[in-house]
């Protein structure tokens, strides 16, 4: 798959950063020494962490060279490392492992989440936010378009790139035996978007990537045209002309045992 596009991702940075801010607001630890930002992207979440904990040894982790370059330019005094989160092991126990909108792209959560929790220092915190929108019209439309077109064979596995987020009960059972406390909540954000095209542009940077990457440029344009037609009907204009994009997200904050 082609590398991520930081410029496209940042088109809706305020909307993408709001859940990161909400997640950070639920972290109550003070003066952490070691922090890792897993899936740091272009550094918007890392910047929040740096402002909150300016004295911490903060490292941003991502597998995208383009995103890391953008993050380093944004925060030249912070450390960024290219790594696969599945293979990531810090050199010392972490006081805070923060993952905003990244772990939904990884598989094997029953192994991954306890593994991350085990890499915390005593009283450390694992803080996670994941989009939980695969059943939303925006993502159902992706699968519908993929199954109906000349790209059907090419895109057979596109939907498997991202697994469905597990239930809150499942994550609680994975973490609670190894944690002092586990807080889980779900929030649905309603983003007023100026047009159906704006919704498509938002998703081109993230959810649509596995569907567009295998296609030729001509097929990408045709796919997006078909997708836009469905989105236009799925998100009708409100009284002010805007389209309301519902975006549910799952939050998890697990506190390590003392």
UniProtKB/Swiss-Prot annotation:
Superkingdom field: Bacteria
GO cellular component, one term: cytoplasm
One MF annotation (Gene Ontology) recorded for this entry: trans-aconitate 2-methyltransferase activity
EC assignment: 2.1.1.144
EC category: transferase
Principal location class: cytoplasm
Pfam families according to UniProt: Methyltransf_25
CDD domains given in the database record: AdoMet_MTases
Sorted UniProt keywords: Cytoplasm, Methyltransferase, S-adenosyl-L-methionine, Transferase
PANTHER family: TRANS-ACONITATE 2-METHYLTRANSFERASE (PTHR43861:SF1), TRANS-ACONITATE 2-METHYLTRANSFERASE-RELATED (PTHR43861)
NCBIfam families in alphabetical order: PRK01683.1 (NF002463)
Protein name: Trans-aconitate 2-methyltransferase
Recorded name of the encoding gene: tam
């Amino acid at each position: 798959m082609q590398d991520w596009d930081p410029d496209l991702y940042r088109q809706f940075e305020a909307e993408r950063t709001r859940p990161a801010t909400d997640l950070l607001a639920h972290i109550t630890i003070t003066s952490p020494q070691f922090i890792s930002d897993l899936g740091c992207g272009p550094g918007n979440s890392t910047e929040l962490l740096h402002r909150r904990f300016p004295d911490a040894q903060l490292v941003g982790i991502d597998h995208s060279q383009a995103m890391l370059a953008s993050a380093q330019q944004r925060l030249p005094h912070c450390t960024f490392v290219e790594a696969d989160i599945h293979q990531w092991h810090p050199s010392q126990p972490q006081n805070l492992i923060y993952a905003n909108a990244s772990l939904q792209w990884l598989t094997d959560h029953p192994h991954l989440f306890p593994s991350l929790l085990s890499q915390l220092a005593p009283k450390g915190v694992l803080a996670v936010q994941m989009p939980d929108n695969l059943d939303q019209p925006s993502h159902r439309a992706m699968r519908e378009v993929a199954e109906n077109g000349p790209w059907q064979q090419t895109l057979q596995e596109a939907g498997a790139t991202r697994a469905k987020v597990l239930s809150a009960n499942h994550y609680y059972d994975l973490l609670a035996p190894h944690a002092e406390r586990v807080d889980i909540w779900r929030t649905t954000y309603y983003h007023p978007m100026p047009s159906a095209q704006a919704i498509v542009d938002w998703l081109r940077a993230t959810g649509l990537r596995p569907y567009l990457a295998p296609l030729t440029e001509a097929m990408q344009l045709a796919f997006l045209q078909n997708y836009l037609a469905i989105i236009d009907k799925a998100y009708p204009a409100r009284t002010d002309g805007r389209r309301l994009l519902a975006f549910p997200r799952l939050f998890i904050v697990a506190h390590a045992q003392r």
